[in-house]
């Protein structure tokens, strides 16, 4: 029994030490730009493991040198309550939960009506804020477990405590994936439009923002009807997006 308690204590201590390490890294980001993220390193290893060339395009640019159109487009598309929440948008999570439950119920009904007919899996929505996405990409693995989601919540709150909204958005826009080996706003602007992130037009910014949930897929499908339609929607919402 003592051995079991000792083992549990060691695991708890290791978990606490890891979280403290993450928090210290976040605090340092108030003045230091992260050289890479956990997600980026994972992508690099995947490319190397496939014996292909390492594709990595990224160039850090200060917040002031990123088009206001892109900032507004990303907020409008990914997290319209960004400036007001404290890292986690509970209302968005509740809405996502309801949509997912409704979609799963519809799938269950379809399977009951035609059990031998294949049914397309529902699209799962997460309701993650920009801060949560940054916490996940910066520091966490890609696994989908309740423990990792809990870590994401804790780290999102830490990001909001130690960093300003402007700094969070700056780090996010400089590190988010925008295609195969394309990371950050500057690399994306040059890859897709042959211009600096500072000079993106509203339509270009909206299109880049719409790509974010599935950048590799949309990179291969530039003529996607969904991409075009969603771009028009985000263009209409950009004027109401509040910047930090």
Model-derived features with residue positions:
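Juxtamembrane regions of bacterial inner-membrane/periplasmic proteins
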Residues: 1-244
């Amino acid at each position: 029994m003592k051995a079991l308690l000792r083992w549990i204590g060691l695991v708890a201590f290791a978990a606490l030490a890891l979280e403290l390490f993450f928090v210290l890294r976040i605090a340092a980001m108030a003045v230091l730009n992260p050289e890479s993220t956990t997600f980026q390193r994972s992508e690099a290893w995947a490319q190397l493991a496939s014996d292909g060339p390492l594709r990595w395009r990224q160039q850090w640019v200060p917040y002031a040198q990123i088009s206001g159109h892109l900032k507004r487009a990303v907020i409008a598309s990914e997290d319209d309550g960004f400036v007001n929440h404290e890292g986690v948008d509970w209302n968005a999570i509740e809405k996502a939960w309801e949509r997912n439950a409704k979609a799963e119920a519809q799938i269950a009904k379809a399977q009951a009506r035609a059990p031998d007919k294949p049914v397309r899996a529902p699209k799962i929505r997460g309701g993650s804020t920009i801060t949560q996405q940054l916490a996940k990409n910066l520091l966490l693995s890609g696994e989908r477990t309740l423990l990792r989601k809990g870590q994401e919540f804790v780290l999102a709150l830490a990001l909001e405590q130690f960093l300003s909204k402007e700094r969070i958005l700056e780090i996010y826009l400089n590190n988010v994936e925008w295609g195969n080996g394309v990371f950050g706003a500057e690399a994306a602007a040059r890859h897709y439009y042959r211009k600096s992130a500072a000079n993106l037009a509203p339509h270009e910014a909206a299109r880049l923002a719409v790509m974010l949930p599935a950048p590799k897929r949309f990179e291969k499908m530039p003529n996607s009807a969904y991409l075009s339609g969603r771009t028009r929607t985000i263009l209409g919402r950009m004027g109401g997006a509040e910047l930090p």
